[in-house]
């Protein structure tokens, strides 16, 4: 058996985010950076690749773990980096005091990098984590010039409530916010080219239709297999890794997840979108809470709002998450035992219809790239949709235009 050398992963895209991190390293102040984005988007990968895993301290929160156990792991992490045996911490104030003490032993002429990943998992019920973090930042780190604290986590609700929109001691303390979006089609092509995949551009377009450019989903694919074989492997085999992804996707991100699922399901049933008033009527959600749900879903790229042509004050919300759309169409409520269902049904009318609708959505998601290809990226434009309801009385059919680009100079 020949020895093989594992090729290290390559950081695709993320140019703006890397530029921001470089600015943090060069600034003359301490930086509190939060890295946001949906589950599987590559938050940890970005930070690890940029810093080449060279941290002065790093810690990963543990899922559904009691406070004292989290504190014990935190103590072990400080012991690993400092080389000094740690006592048992009574609370998070003790833990951050120990972190301060260790960091003060490091050279003063460089930035110290602290990476706390899965931060929402650390904040267990009745823990003192957030208040201790506030004390650490306001009372010590923010008064220095050499600290870069990076906080990351998939739980969007927590990141928004506790950090971004914090009304307490962390109010307006975040110095940089990195929001990671899914790969574009171009970045997805770059990803496959990075290991000499034989997939054609049409193949890559089809891959985008069910992965939506989510890096982790792309990483599960076998680039030497056909698109159909990959779909069977990812969704229809007995141990298919993405078959159960939906069960965790939203619950990992949001509290009150049932309300989020209500919005997702009603938007799936109305593929061309609903206004906020229509969503409220269908889900019985309203007011500030509905605004929060819609904002968080938009933040994670699950939904988008579009203007209706000629009605600039009317926003329509549409489900745009490619994985969720694929799951509802072909996986949910289906109990087919065929492990190669996709390969056996390539001419299925449902697949053809899905591909048509999904291609429209890809165009909407890439309207900036389309404008650039048309040579109008430097001109002010608005992107909207247009629809005309059928007039049954006069036997006039309805019509829809999925993407209208209106130039401001015409």
Name these PLM-found stretches:
Residues 309, 315-410:
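A cross-kingdom feature that marks ATP-driven nucleic-acid transaction machinery
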Residues 1-341:
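Phosphate-binding site recognition
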């Amino acid at each position: 058996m020949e020895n093989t050398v594992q090729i290290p992963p390559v950081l695709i895209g993320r140019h703006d985010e890397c530029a921001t991190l470089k600015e943090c390293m060069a600034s003359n102040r301490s930086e509190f950076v939060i890295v946001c984005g949906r589950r599987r988007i590559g938050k940890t990968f970005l930070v690890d690749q940029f810093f080449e895993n060279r941290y002065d301290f790093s810690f990963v929160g543990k899922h559904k773990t009691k406070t004292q156990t989290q504190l014990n792991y935190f103590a072990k992490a400080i012991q690993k980096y400092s080389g000094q045996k740690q006592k048992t911490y009574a609370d998070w104030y003790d833990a951050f005091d120990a972190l301060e003490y260790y960091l003060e032993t490091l050279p003063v002429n460089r930035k110290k990098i602290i990476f706390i990943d899965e931060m929402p998992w650390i904040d267990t019920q009745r823990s003192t984590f957030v208040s201790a973090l506030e004390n650490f930042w306001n009372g010590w780190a923010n008064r220095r010039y050499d600290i870069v604290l990076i906080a990351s986590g998939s739980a969007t609700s927590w990141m928004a409530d506790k950090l971004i929109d914090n009304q307490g001691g962390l109010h307006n303390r975040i110095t940089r916010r990195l929001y990671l979006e899914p790969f574009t089609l171009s970045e997805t092509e770059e990803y496959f080219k990075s290991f000499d995949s034989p997939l054609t551009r049409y193949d890559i377009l089809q891959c985008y239709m069910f992965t939506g450019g989510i890096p982790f989903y792309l990483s599960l694919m076998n680039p030497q297999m056909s698109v159909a074989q990959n779909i069977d492997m990812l969704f229809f085999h007995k141990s298919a890794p993405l078959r159960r992804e939906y069960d965790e996707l939203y619950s990992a991100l949001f509290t009150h997840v049932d309300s989020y699922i209500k919005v997702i399901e009603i938007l799936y049933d109305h593929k061309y979108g609903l206004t906020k008033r229509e969503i409220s009527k269908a889900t019985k959600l309203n007011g500030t809470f509905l605004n929060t749900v819609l904002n968080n879903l938009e933040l994670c790229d699950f939904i988008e709002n579009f203007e209706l042509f000629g009605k600039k004050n009317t926003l329509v919300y549409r489900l745009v998450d490619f994985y969720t759309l694929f799951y509802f169409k072909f996986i949910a409520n289906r109990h087919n035992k065929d492990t190669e269902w996709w390969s056996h049904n390539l001419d299925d009318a449902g697949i053809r219809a899905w591909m048509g609708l999904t291609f429209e959505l890809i165009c909407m998601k890439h309207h900036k790239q389309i404008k650039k290809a048309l040579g109008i990226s430097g001109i002010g434009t608005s992107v909207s949709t247009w629809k005309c309801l059928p007039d049954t009385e006069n036997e006039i059919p309805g019509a829809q235009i999925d993407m209208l680009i209106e130039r401001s100079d015409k």
